[in-house]
């Protein structure tokens, strides 16, 4: 176990104690909700250009190196790790012993060492607090977080004044100059996404919940497309809102908490999230008024305002943080072109095609420096920034799991219809999408009459309880059918161009869109 020398060391403080320290240290203030409110300066989202993975003998042939998984030498990592240790040795540090992964076979013990008390609270909220000594002899991973230490690109071999470095061989993750706490959870997500596939576990960027009878649903999607909102269902039990593993026998949460977007949060539309933001939670970059009341509509700090809270703040939750293999898998796509249906039933090959494509939109992007507003993107596996191995590794595991369980996969458009974004189209309302999801989870959607949507070759239902029939076929929602066809053809061409980079069996390639006719 890594020994940490510091001026003062606080070990395994309770959330209450960490909140007291954070307020006393001037790291944040208590809001009217009871949640701790903090700000993170210029870094209000992830910094993908500042994220590196150590390239060594173990990882050289296993990681898909490039702009997402940037390589860094062991020597460069070691020098910065030592600099961070020296920096922290002159300060008070906070240490918590946690774990990631709710499955006894696949969890990782985790030692979190932070300069800020609120970063340690974030780790306690988002990771899993084990009961007793639960390491079972497993070697522990170590997170070192020194947001007050800045990097020098020339001296430290990095790109800016901050860096995230993941050392998969040494089980170390380093954060320097990174006040945005979301970096911590996504770094450990990347670690599990690297480690689990050789153990026949599919890691997934998805939310998961369970019905009264134990039936499990998975919601894949990028930030802002509806994972957290749709999985926080008043009639179902939450497993988790963002990161899960799918083994041969179960679905299990990687985390012990939720990290919800707060922009335009409404008590009426999202009561479970609203009520979870209370004492013990953290509000990150949420604007407060002079009375400490949060204004969730105020985006002056960022569109990516967040709340971190433990699963215990959600009354309807699966206690053991896991469930059986899924009965339904939903790919949430936010279509800005307004040409995809609100729901489609996918074959196994189509599931692999749309999983690899990961077509969606960046809605209030989680990345620093992103363009304000909304832009479309193809994000492999519905989470390209977090998957270190080649994408086909994950796609093959997905097909294997679908084949073994026979679960139905659905494509659900939470984006626009009747026209494109900014060109007369309207976004599907949350109640409409919830009705679609309810129809999926009832099992009735796949039993009713269907038709095929030309061009995309998608099987779509002719009716769904609680949804206007005319919304189900996107071609019928456009006033000008020829304008729909032209826009659909344009998107189909984008799909084809994006898919050229994948080396996959013909059956998967042919499951994609063809020309509109």
Curated annotation (Swiss-Prot):
**EC code(s) of this entry:** 4.1.1.49
Biological-process GO terms, alphabetical: gluconeogenesis
Tell me any Pfam family this protein matches: PEPCK_ATP
Give the co-factor note: Binds 1 Mn(2+) ion per subunit.
Enzymatic reactions:
oxaloacetate + ATP = phosphoenolpyruvate + ADP + CO2
Q: Which GO terms describe its molecular function?
A: ATP binding; metal ion binding; phosphoenolpyruvate carboxykinase (ATP) activity
Origin superkingdom: Bacteria
Which locations, inside or outside the cell, does it occupy?
A: Cytoplasm
Show the GO cellular component annotation of the record.
cytosol
Binding-site list for substrate: 46, 180, 186, 306
Provide the binding site for Mn(2+): 186, 205, 242
**Which pathway features in its UniProt record?**
Carbohydrate biosynthesis; gluconeogenesis
**What's this chain's function?**
Involved in the gluconeogenesis. Catalyzes the conversion of oxaloacetate (OAA) to phosphoenolpyruvate (PEP) through direct phosphoryl transfer between the nucleoside triphosphate and OAA.
**Family membership:** Belongs to the phosphoenolpyruvate carboxykinase (ATP) family.
Protein name per UniProt:
Phosphoenolpyruvate carboxykinase (ATP)
Instruction: State the organism of origin.
Output: Coxiella burnetii (strain CbuK_Q154) (Coxiella burnetii (strain Q154))
